[in-house]
């Protein structure tokens, strides 16, 4: 048993002493900052005990750790977080976990990353942290998590690798599904306007122009002049629908709708929210695969009219 004070649950295929990084009865304890990461871990290591920090509707950009979160981080065999300044209020706590932590976004090749319009506290340029909206990036993340789990629990390294490969194949399948859905939208209507700027990777991969009423972080909203310029863009391109997301910023969306009306164009707000930085509470939006399909279906239904 680790000296971390784990509170593990039983599993049938592992004994308490078969890996240095297991709880007393053999079950890995994993702390994941987002539902996307937790879902990836569960697909790779379905017997692991996974605690997800930011639940449905939560915002990892602004989330601040609770006392319970900090206790669970200390107890975990592995802490999985996005990095790339996503968990902006928890950087020190997460990075200080040494070999027990991995910031999966930091493991991506730089050429896979998109720019972010902000800098860190020292003025260094950052990258867009919404990496799950690129299926190639997410496959890389799955491989990174699998490798790290294999280091912690070498007796099951091959199982993790096999599960990761199966999950990566599912991600390829969902990429094909999403592309087919987006292809049903007429090319001149492939504009996605949302309340949170989480879909730039999605747009790059699947062929959509992305606009949003905030910048990459949900804490950074557009000025009235920015809203006016975006409204003019919507009117000029005759974009029929704008989207809220599950972070819910209705004031900005409603302000944008009014500004579009002032430009002489009528735009609707979709009655279905897109899923941005957190999973949903129930199927199908409680998984990465489910959300990718749901978002694509929602976009195609609204923009393909």
What are the functions of these language-model segments?
Residues 5-305:
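Extracytoplasmic metal-acquisition and chelation regions
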């Amino acid at each position: 048993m680790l000296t971390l004070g784990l509170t593990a649950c039983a599993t049938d295929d592992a004994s308490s002493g078969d890996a240095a990084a297991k709880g007393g009865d053999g079950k890995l304890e994993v702390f994941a900052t987002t539902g996307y990461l937790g879902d990836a871990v569960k697909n790779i290591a379905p017997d692991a005990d996974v605690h997800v920090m930011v639940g449905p509707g939560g915002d990892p950009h602004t989330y601040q750790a609770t006392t319970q979160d900090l206790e669970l981080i200390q107890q975990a065999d592995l802490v999985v977080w996005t990095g790339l300044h996503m968990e902006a209020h928890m950087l020190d706590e997460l990075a200080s976990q040494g070999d027990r932590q991995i910031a999966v976004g930091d493991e991506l090749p730089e050429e896979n990353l998109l720019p972010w319009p902000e800098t860190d506290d020292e003025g260094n340029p950052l990258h867009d942290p919404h990496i799950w909206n690129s299926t190639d990036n997410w496959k890389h993340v799955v491989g990174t998590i699998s490798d790290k789990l294999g280091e912690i629990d070498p007796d099951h390294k091959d199982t993790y690798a096999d599960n990761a490969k199966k999950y990566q194949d599912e991600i390829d399948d969902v990429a094909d599904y999403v592309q087919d859905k987006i292809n049903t939208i007429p090319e001149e209507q492939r504009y996605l306007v949302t309340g949170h700027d989480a879909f730039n990777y999605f747009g790059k991969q699947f062929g959509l122009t992305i606009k949003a009423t905030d910048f990459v972080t949900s804490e950074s909203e557009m000025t009235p002049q920015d809203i006016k310029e975006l409204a003019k863009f919507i009117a000029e391109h005759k974009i029929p629908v704008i989207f809220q997301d599950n972070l819910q910023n209705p004031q900005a969306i409603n302000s944008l709708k009014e500004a579009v009306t002032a430009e002489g164009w009528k735009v609707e707000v979709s009655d279905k929210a897109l899923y941005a930085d957190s999973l949903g509470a129930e199927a199908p939006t409680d998984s990465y695969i489910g959300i990718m399909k749901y978002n694509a279906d929602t976009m195609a239904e609204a923009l393909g009219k």
